[in-house]
């Protein structure tokens, strides 16, 4: 199994980067795993048209990196909510398609609709707001938890 995490921008907070490293190490027990940073568009003003342009550009960059046969999971505020066991079952089912999973997070402005159309799975972490870097950390933790659940290992500690 291959698992890739894609995120626009590069995290500067050491404590979060340390968390990424820890979960990449833990996940390497179960799969070949990687974290890839994508270009993040800088917006000079928060106008709707500027944000839309930036999201389209970020989406184009992301879609170039995702192969047609990869299963794309997106973290999206509009996505479906799952508990940990449901999410583990979903990952297990999707990984049986070809074993190549990609988890994509949007920038702080979200995701373009072209990404939503390409996604195989759209899920929400919570109704709470997180930075996209923290959302990636939480996603990695949940993927790790899912792997443990799917193998019948203790997962709640």
Label each region the model flagged.
Residues 113-157:
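Structured adenosyl-cofactor binding patch, chiefly the S-adenosyl-L-methionine
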Residues 1-27:
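N-terminal beta1-alpha1 ligand-phosphate binding loop
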Residues 6, 34-36:
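General small-molecule cofactor/ligand-binding pocket signal
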Residues 2, 99-104:
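Loop/turn-to-beta-strand initiation segments
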Residues 31, 69-70, 119:
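Short, well-ordered alpha-helix to beta-strand connector turns
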């Amino acid at each position: 199994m291959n698992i890739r995490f894609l995120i626009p921008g590069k995290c500067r907070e050491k404590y979060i980067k340390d968390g990424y490293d820890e979960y990449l190490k833990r996940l390497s027990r179960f799969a070949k795993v990687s974290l890839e940073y994508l270009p993040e568009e800088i917006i000079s003003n928060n106008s709707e048209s500027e944000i839309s342009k930036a999201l389209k550009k970020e989406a184009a960059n992301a879609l170039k990196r995702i192969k047609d046969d990869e299963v794309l999971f997106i973290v999206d505020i509009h996505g479906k909510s799952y508990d940990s066991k449901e999410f583990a079952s979903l990952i297990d089912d999707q990984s049986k398609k070809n074993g190549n999973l990609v988890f994509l997070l949007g920038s702080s402005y979200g995701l373009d609709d072209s990404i939503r159309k390409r996604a195989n799975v759209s899920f929400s972490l919570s109704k709470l707001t997180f930075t996209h870097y923290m959302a990636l950390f939480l996603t990695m933790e949940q993927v790790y938890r899912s792997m443990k659940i799917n193998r019948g290992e203790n997962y709640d500690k």
